Every structure is written in C-alpha cells, then in structure tokens.
A protein has these predicted regions:
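Active-site neighborhoods and metal-handling regions in enzymes and metal-associated proteins
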Residues: 1-259
Length: 259
C-alpha cells in the first residue's frame, strides 16, 4: 500500500512474519497474537531503478516486554556500532565484527554465553544467535553484484571464512565513497541451530543451553537500514523510519487507537 501509493513497485518479495528466526519466511497466513514480535523486511524500487531494503521489528500489542526490549536495544546498539564504521577504507568484515561484538556483550550479560564478548566472537558463539552477515551491497539489485559471486563481493586475496556465521558474509571489500550497503544485525532463537550438536558441541564450555532454552519461542529481531558511504560521516538513507524503542512503541500504539 505505501509503496503503491508512491507510484513505485516492490524491490523484492516482502518478508512479513512473526517467525523472525526464519530468515526468508514469505508465508503470511498467521494470525497476530498478543506478545508476539512482527518483523517486516521490505523495500521499494525507485523510479531510477535503485532498490531499497529496510527491516523493522515491532511488538504486535504496541509494548515491548522487558526481554524483548533488552534484545531489541542490543540489536540497535549493534547496528549503531556497525553504521559508525561505514567509512572509506574500512573493511566490511570489520563492520560485521563490530556488530557481532555488541551482540556478544548482550549474550554474556544475559548468561547465554560465558566469558568475554571478544572470546565469544573469536570462537563464533555469537553466530548461534546471529547466523548471517551484517549486510550487503545495495544498488539496482537488492543484493548488488551477487550474481557475479565472490570475485565481485570479496576483494582479491580474500576468501570466505569457514566459521559458521562469518562464512555467510556477503561482502568483504574495503568501503569506498559512493557505496551503499545495508546494515542489518539481528538476534534470533533458532531451535534447529541450538539443537545442532555439530554447532553447539565445540562451544559447550562457554554456551549455556539451559539458559538458551528459557528463550524458546522468542523468534527473532532484525533492524536494517541503507547506508551511503561518503567522504565524511555515514549517511543513513532510511533514517526517517522509526526504530528506537520509544518511537516504535509510540507509532504502533497510535495505530492501535480506535478511530
């Protein structure tokens, strides 16, 4: 409706789901229930052919629970850390790792992971709850240049990591002025990942699966914006879309008011 009202077309099939832990869940036949989080990943194609790619997550009832709020603010902090590094000459892998470190701090604070956040990231423990890369190039394709494979997305001499999570990073080049990238960290509780002994076994000394079980049914949160790399500070092209806890609750709450 919003896209059509602007005379535009969708840049890709939108993801609208209460099962945010399923990363590309296009099924939309669920009934919204009190206490759930709704994740919307969508974007429009501009009249010049360029794509946008934005994600917001909000509480169906208009109010984050304490646990939802803590996780949401951790994802937002991770996004802020990553966005701040979107500057010329910065390696995109380092942008990703900055987001990972912020999320790892949350995991340690919540008792999901023991030890230091730095060790958690080095060993890939954070990826059990953030199993994808922090973003990708954005252009006339949503995942720009991806059809050309790693020879376009990775700088010469750089190869994909074999570590779970980091290996899904779509881009590993040094950022340049004029680049537009997405920054989209998330926090997900994925039963299949936490039940995979091949992933959790090597981390059993720092991973608290009993604590993780207490988060069962949480589903997922993702926050995504489109960032223009300039000669100076990063420019958030989608900053007008509310994303702070206060703004999200106010906007959703207002939409729920009768009349």
């Amino acid at each position: 409706g919003v896209i059509a009202a602007g005379g535009l077309v969708p840049a890709y099939t939108s993801i609208v789901t209460v099962r945010g832990e399923i990363l590309h869940n296009h099924g939309r036949d669920n009934l919204l229930e009190d206490g759930q989080l709704l994740l919307l990943d969508g974007g429009a194609e501009s009249i010049t052919g360029y794509a946008t790619d934005v994600t917001r997550t909000w509480p169906v009832n208009g109010q984050f629970s304490p646990r939802q709020k803590a996780a949401y603010e951790a994802v937002l902090a991770a996004q802020h850390a990553a966005i701040d590094l979107c500057r010329p000459g910065v390696r995109y892998r380092d942008v990703h790792l900055a987001a990972c470190l912020e999320l790892a701090r949350f995991l340690v604070d919540e008792g999901l992971v023991r030890g230091s956040p730095e060790d958690a990231v080095a060993r890939g423990a954070h990826a059990l709850f953030f199993p994808h890369g922090v973003g990708h190039l954005l252009g006339m394709d949503v995942h720009d240049l991806e059809n050309f494979g790693d020879q376009a997305a990775y700088a010469p001499g750089r190869e994909r990591s074999t570590q779970f999570g980091l290996g899904y990073l779509r881009l590993d080049r040094d950022l340049e002025p004029g680049n537009v990238v997405t920054i989209e960290p998330g926090f997900y509780v994925v039963p299949a990942i936490l039940a995979d002994e091949g992933l959790t076994g090597p981390l059993r000394d720092i991973l608290d699966l009993d604590r993780a079980a207490e988060w069962s049914g949480f589903c997922g949160i993702r926050i995504e914006d489109d960032i223009h790399v300039t000669e100076g500070d990063p420019e958030n092209l989608t900053a007008a879309i509310p994303k702070t806890v206060a703004d999200v609750e106010a906007r959703v709450g207002a939409a729920m008011m009768p009349g």
